[in-house]
Amino acid sequence: MASTKTGLVLIHPGATEDPSSVVNAQEQARSEGVSVEAQFLINKINDGSVKLEDNHYDEVRYVTPEASDEIRFPSKLIGVIGKSLKTNGKLYGLSDLYKLDALINEFEISRSENHYCWIKKASIKAEPVAVPLRNHKKTTTPGTTTTAKKSLPIFKRATDNDSTKNKQQKQQHTGPARVSLDSEDEDEESEGSSDPSDSKSKFFEKSGSPLTENDSIEEDELVDENEMREPSLTMITCGKSKTRRRKACKDCTCGQKEIEEEELDGVRKQQDKVVKFSDQELTEIDFTVQGKKVGGCGSCTLGDAFRCSGCPYLGLPAFKPGQQIDLSSMGDDL
C-alpha cells in the first residue's frame, strides 16, 4: 500500500468569513491523495506562536480571499514554509508577485492549465575541494633560473650608437619628406624652456591691446545720482573732541546728550498719552439699533444663549432692535 502524502492548510484571517473556501481546499487535497494533518492561521506562524516541522509536509495550500495580483504575504514565511516541505513538495496559493522570493528559497515555478504551484527542489550542497598550497618544483638547467612566478623583463640602457642606428632606421621607413620626431621634441623643449612672462605677453597681444589708464573705471560712475541724493547715516559732531559719532559720549559735556534725551522724552510722552473717547464717539456704536455698527457677536437682542461673556445685557430677556433698555437696576446689583 502506498504511503499517503501529508498536507497543511494555511488560512488568511479574511478567509474565516467564508468557511467554504477552506473546505474546498481540503477536499481538493484529498482528491489528489493528500491527507491534511493540520490547518493554521497565517498570522500564528508569522508571530512565532506556531512552529512548523522541517521536511514534514508534501503539500501546503494557502487559502486567501485576495485576488492573485493583490496578494499580500510575508516574504520571510516563504523560507519557513520551504523548510517544512519535503523535496519535490508543492506550495499552492501564491502568485508571480513573489516569484523572486520563490527562486531565492530554491523553489521552481510550475505552470499548467489547471494548477499553478511552486515545487521545492533539492538543495545543492557545496563540496569541499582540496587546494595544494605548495608550488610544484620545476627542474632547472645550468644557466637558467626558473621560479613559480614569471621572470621580469630585463631592460638595457641605450648607448649613443644604438640611438644613431634607430634614427637611421626611422628615416629609411618614413622617408625624407617627414620631419623627425626628435626635431619636434627639441622644438617643444625650446618653447617650454622660455620665460613664462613671454607667454603671457603673447597671450595679451593676441587678445587685444593692453589696458591703459583711460580704460580704468571710476568708482563714482558706478553710483547713480538718485543714490547719492539719499540721506546717509546721521552722524553727530562732538563739540568737545570735534569728532563725528553716532551717539553722544558717555561723559558728554557739549550738550549732545541732553538733546538726545529731549528727543527720547518727546517720544515717550506721545506713547504715554491715554486714548479717550468723547460722548459722540461712544454712542457711535449702538448694539440695539438694527443696521448700525455692532460688536463682535451682533446678537445682543436675541437673549443670553447668543450673548458674549462680557455683554452688558446678560441676565435680561430678549428685546427688539431699537427698544430702550434701562440698565439702572444692574447698578443696584453691583
Curated annotation (Swiss-Prot):
Residues spanned by motif Cx2C motif 2: 308-311
Pfam families given in the database record: CIAPIN1, DRE2_N
GO terms, molecular function: 2 iron, 2 sulfur cluster binding; 4 iron, 4 sulfur cluster binding; electron transfer activity; metal ion binding
Region (Disordered): 135-229
Keyword NAD: no
Binding-site list for [4Fe-4S] cluster: C297, C300, C308, C311
Region (N-terminal SAM-like domain): 1-131
Residues at which [2Fe-2S] cluster binds: C238, C249, C252, C254
Region described as Fe-S binding site B: spans on this chain: 297-311
Subcellular location: Cytoplasm; Mitochondrion intermembrane space
Biased composition (Low complexity): 140-150
GO biological process, alphabetically ordered: iron-sulfur cluster assembly
Cofactor(s) required, per the database record: [2Fe-2S] cluster; [4Fe-4S] cluster
Keywords carried by this UniProt record: 2Fe-2S, 4Fe-4S, Cytoplasm, Iron, Iron-sulfur, Metal-binding, Mitochondrion
Superkingdom of the organism of origin: Eukaryota
GO cellular component terms, A-Z: mitochondrial intermembrane space
Matches recorded under PANTHER family: ANAMORSIN (PTHR13273:SF14)
Domain notes: The C-terminal domain binds 2 Fe-S clusters but is otherwise mostly in an intrinsically disordered conformation.
Summary of subunit composition and partner proteins: Monomer. Interacts with TAH18. Interacts with MIA40.
Family: Belongs to the anamorsin family.
Protein name: Fe-S cluster assembly protein DRE2
The organism of origin for this protein: Zygosaccharomyces rouxii (strain ATCC 2623 / CBS 732 / NBRC 1130 / NCYC 568 / NRRL Y-229)
High-level lineage: Eukaryota, Fungi, Dikarya, Ascomycota, Saccharomycotina
